[in-house]
UniProtKB/Swiss-Prot annotation:
Positions of [4Fe-4S] cluster 1 binding: 14, 50, 79
Cofactor binding summary note: Binds 2 [4Fe-4S] clusters. One cluster is coordinated with 3 cysteines and an exchangeable S-adenosyl-L-methionine.
Protein name: Ribosomal protein uS12 methylthiotransferase RimO
Domain of life: Bacteria
Family designation: Belongs to the methylthiotransferase family. RimO subfamily.
Reactions listed under catalytic activity: L-aspartate(89)-[ribosomal protein uS12]-hydrogen + (sulfur carrier)-SH + AH2 + 2 S-adenosyl-L-methionine = 3-methylsulfanyl-L-aspartate(89)-[ribosomal protein uS12]-hydrogen + (sulfur carrier)-H + 5'-deoxyadenosine + L-methionine + A + S-adenosyl-L-homocysteine + 2 H(+)
Residue span, Radical SAM core domain: 132-384
SUPFAM superfamilies xref list: Radical SAM enzymes
Positions annotated to bind [4Fe-4S] cluster 2: 146, 150, 153
InterPro entries assigned: Elp3/MiaA/NifB-like_rSAM (IPR006638), Methylthiotransferase (IPR005839), Methylthiotransferase_CS (IPR020612), Methylthiotransferase_N (IPR013848), Methylthiotransferase_N_sf (IPR038135), Ribosomal_uS12_MeSTrfase_RimO (IPR005840), rSAM (IPR007197), rSAM_horseshoe (IPR023404)
Length: 431
């Protein structure tokens, strides 16, 4: 009997990395490899790493070490794969190191260290590929890389410049996901609103209609699938205004995950972020005028090098005016290779500006500013995050935010219909 190699797989990092893991696993399954959920039963382990924040690098190195200790045969891929010298220095036992989206060389390494009898098992793989998300939703990655040059970020160095997929290619994948029973699509990329810029918005045919490879046509086409479509990682560019009417019409979910990071013009300038605070506020108000049910989420960085008390107050004032429905607030963390590391590392306290070396370790100024920002949002985020009409708001803990912060999310409309049915039954019964 031919032994089929068993592969253990660890996926770290963001949703974009998870999609990479899905593609790798789909390829392995198509070749007949078994996937197992423990180190002990695996002939080899693949670790798909994250290499963005220093904390993510530490976690990736720790997991690689754990896999080596528990199994011994380890292949490393993903964002940290671009720092092969660092991995080899820490873990010389690693068998192979490949970077993000380097699927061909990774699979070749798998063949080398866990060879399999040549065969074609494509028929055993579902048309939509192997998915690591729950069955009801799936990530839909529309591009790789990024053209922005934010000073706190090294994504372009890790994943390269923007590389958009053609719109017909994306729609074919979306259709396969729908046919597989997926109800919700989470559209992701590094910069969703820049989709198609690099391929000059080239046209594609789907469902006998011509569409351009831009975010507006893509949202329109996805809206015709009769699925929930949610847009993530959107920059507040002017053309995003054209997407909001689709939300008002019920074509896609009235939800925008908008990358803001800060509001102070000085901080944004140092971050090299393409944003103008007043225009952003005007745009948010315009979106709400067009689609009153829209839910807007964002993330912010506090304690960025050079941030002053005035800058932080500007951010608090912006938060009060914007009244965002959902926020993630993060303390600035140095990223190896980021240009922001060269800035004067100044952050404020209520009494003035101090250098980080003057901060008491038990309560850093970054934590103070983050705590203050979160306190403001505690009063402003307990609102129904409407993604469709007739939903019941329910309080849940959101692991993406501070543990003390609770947000309202929505329970599917079937529940409210059930409640109404029960109430009507009781009224009729006891009338």
């Amino acid at each position: 009997m031919i032994k089929i190699p068993k592969i253990g797989f660890v996926s770290l990092g963001c949703p974009k990395n998870l999609v990479d893991s899905e593609r790798i696993i789909t390829k392995l399954k198509a070749e007949g490899y078994d996937l197992v959920d423990s180190y002990d039963n695996a002939d080899m382990v693949i670790v798909n790493t994250c290499g963005f924040l220093n904390s993510a690098i530490d976690e990736s190195l720790e997991v690689i070490g754990e896999a080596i200790a528990e199994n011994g045969k380890v292949l490393v891929t993903g964002c940290l794969g671009n720092k092969a010298d660092l991995i080899k220095e820490k873990h010389p036992e690693v068998l192979s190191i490949t970077g993000p989206q380097d699927y061909e060389n990774l699979i070749e390494a798998v063949h080398t260290h866990a060879p399999i009898f040549a065969n074609d098992f494509v028929s055993l793989v579902p048309p939509q590929g192997i998915k690591l998300t729950p069955r009801h939703y799936s990530y839909l990655k529309i591009s790789e890389g990024c053209n922005n040059t934010c000073t706190f970020c090294i994504i372009p160095d890790i994943r390269g410049k923007l590389k958009s997929r053609s719109i017909d290619n994306i729609m074919k994948e979306a259709e396969k996901l729908k046919n597989a029973g997926v109800k919700e699509l989470l559209v992701i990329s590094q910069d969703t609103s820049a989709y198609g810029v690099d391929i000059k918005y080239k046209s594609g045919i789907w469902n006998n209609k011509e569409y351009q490879s831009n975010i507006i046509d893509l949202a329109t086409a996805l809206g015709d699938l009769d699925m929930w479509t949610r847009l993530h990682y959107v920059y507040p560019y002017p053309h995003v205004d054209k997407i909001v009417p689709l939300m008002a019409q019920g074509k896609i979910l009235p939800y925008l995950d908008v990358s803001l990071q800060h509001s102070s013009p000085e901080v944004l300038k140092r971050m090299k972020r393409p944003a103008h605070t007043q225009k952003t506020l005007d745009r948010i108000n315009k979106w709400r005028d067009i689609c009153p049910d829209i839910t807007i989420s964002s993330t912010f960085i506090v304690g960025f090098p050079g941030e002053t008390e005035a800058d932080f107050k500007h951010l608090l004032d912006f938060a009060e005016k914007a009244q965002l429905d959902r926020v993630g607030c993060f303390k600035y963390s140095e990223v190896e290779g980021a240009k922001a590391n060269q800035f004067d590392n100044l952050i404020f306290v209520a009494t003035g500006i101090l250098h980080t070396q003057d901060i008491k370790p038990e309560k850093s100024l970054k934590e103070l500013s983050a705590d203050k920002f979160i306190e403001l949002f505690k009063a402003n985020t307990i609102f129904p995050a409407l993604v469709a009409k007739h939903f019941i708001p329910k309080l849940v803990k959101d692991t993406n935010l501070y543990s003390q912060l609770f947000l309202r999310v929505l329970v599917v409309s079937l529940i409210i219909n059930l409640v109404v049915l029960i109430i009507n039954f009781l009224l009729i019964t006891f009338r």
